[in-house]
């Protein structure tokens, strides 16, 4: 494809991660044309029973860091009058789910934030899409490969490759949102 790839490893669940990543891209003169906010974590327990450091990590990973990445890289895209932002929400963003209240709430934020940001950037040639999938067969749920395979066959989970294709297709077709599988 004639594209040079430079991997940059960062823990996005800590304060300052977004600014550090942005500064690195600026120093290396790497213009970001497509921003995909897909880092995530999941745990099943009532919010008040969760460990404080895990709650904080989830808030950074799902709310603070994606917002800041959109802020920093979105400004560059707005100046260039071109760019794409894909934010990963979840089907859980539509309803409150006991046991995953914090997770669902952070995903609801990403959906709402993405829709508003889309309106703010549309006149500047920057497309923002929010992806709201159901369960995806990744290591997020700590399931065995056999269980993931069964869940895919039963239509309960989606293969990550299939989701990625659907998400990128929606992004490049300037869709506001996509609920794959529905």
Question: Which ranges hold each PLM region?
Answer:
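SDR active-site lid
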Residues: 118-182
